[in-house]
Amino acid sequence: MLAYTLKEGKFVTSAGPIRPNSPQRDLFYRIHWEGDRLLVAGGVNTVGADYYPATAMYWEDGQWTNFQEMESAPEGYTNFRLYNTTHLVQDPEDPTHHFASLYRSGLCEYREGKFERIYHSDNSPLCSILPNDASYYNFVSCSGLSYDQDHNLWMLCSQTDTIIRIRKADGAWRALYYQEIANASLCDDYLMHSSGLVMMVSRRLDKSGIFCLDYNGTLDNRADDRHILRHNIINQDNTSYQPDEFYCIAEDLNGQVWVGTNLGLFLIPDPTTFFDNSFNYEQVKINRNDGSGLADYLLSGVSINCITIDGANRKWIGTHSDGLYLISADGQEMIHHFTTDDSPILSNTIQSIA
């Protein structure tokens, strides 16, 4: 904000600029807490998305910190663009060190909030989805950032032959190819499960589902890997579902995994059984308590965008068009259902929760 004075028929700057402490832009895609710091990735991750400027920021102690943006394109690149930040992660060993994934621009690295470098298809193993295009460097898909327990940074590169890319703790890169997810159109989120399994959301189309990888803690030895993609959902009552969209995944404090789809909420009670031929999902049943002895599946048919678990193991569930639910730890009680009609939320579409 600037102040101007009219002088000799012209407006002349007289004061400013005034810069209130605030988010850099009214943009977000994913939010999550890192200790007392709320990390915000401002973008979008979907086909046909608007080109939102790459936005990364965090809120801590009542103050906003906006990360520095790239001042100019790398030498030799025409119209090099940084758009649509999808995930922002903090180095678990250095709170001043961050990485941000971008829907079509690769991977950004920051130190102390300052832009340090961009990883793209010419200086890293990240791949362009249009390698023969004149602006191939503007089509480097990257999302789903997550650190594992060994300080390796995992990411997802949709619409490429090798979806899973890893920047190891020593700076070396690894690419993990699995036929089940090769060229999947939209892979969006990782879950580093406490058991050591890696679970991933493949959102849509023919390769949608939950992909599970057991790499036995040996990134450099592929021979001992187990992996599977499950699209169809069969519950404990042998009821079958084929969701068009898988949106989110979260581990609760008991190690159970909750999965959000366009057809509702599903549970993986023990992820270590995910590879078994006899594996079934479960749906929480809520007794009607009307003397009929019947029960209904929890949030059946409700499109689930996001899930987070609080310190009491309760489930906060954001939906596509039905507001926000707070569910008890055991799933048997709907504690609250917030909508625009009865709460301060501005929309019944909940994109992310932290």
Regions found by a protein language model. Name each.
Residues 10-24, 63-83, 115-138, 174-183, ...:
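Surface-exposed loop and turn segments in beta-propeller and other repeat-based domains
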Residues 5-6, 42, 51, 59, ...:
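Structural signature of WD-repeat beta-propellers
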